[in-house]
Amino acid sequence: MAATNETKMEYTRLGKSGLKISKVILGAMSFGSSEWQDWVINEDEALPLLKHAYDVGLNTWDTADTYSNGRSEEIIGKALKKYSIPRNKVVILSKCYFGVADDGTQPPISASMVNDGAMVNQVGLSRKHILDAVDNSIARLGTYIDVLQIHRLDRDTPREEIMKALNDVVESGKVRYIGASSVSFNAW
């Protein structure tokens, strides 16, 4: 059952944009693998929740590449396909900054924050990492990203480089809007 005119969900503009999002946002940090964190639910439990959210008009789903090392994004992509949810009916927010292990292992959060060794150039907001992270998120989701948020401010990367890379992923059509998560206004 798709959302109908009788849906009680209310929608609001996202910031100063024209994009409308549900006032309630479904956070998907807890979707993925308990190997990442013991409180995470698996795909079989998460998929029906995404379907129900869609059915009641909750059209905004928030995830990040680092959640369960990419599994959260994969589950959202599977829900779109499994339930034939029209892509234009949901708003997908994702984030980049933290590293995602290439080998499919579930590194602890602390290991995904170090831009060195095995994770060099896979953490932070360098142009390289932003472009790679977006491509990888799109591969996991199977679709474009409506809102890409930086998950933290990267003080080691020039702000101009960050903003140029974010602009470029929007200009490419891979991302529709940009934003920030866990960043204070004064940080800039």
Where are these regions (language model features)?
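Beta-hairpin (beta-strand-turn-beta-strand) motif
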Residues: 66, 95-97, 153
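Conserved beta-strand positions
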Residues: 26, 63, 94, 147-150, ...
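Glycine-rich beta-alpha junction loops
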Residues: 96-98, 184-185
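Glycine/proline-rich, positively charged
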Residues: 34, 106-188
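N-terminal binding-site loop/beta-alpha segment at the start of enzyme catalytic domains
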Residues: 1-91, 100
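Eukaryotic helix-linker segments that join adjacent hydrophobic helices
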Residues: 84, 95, 101-115
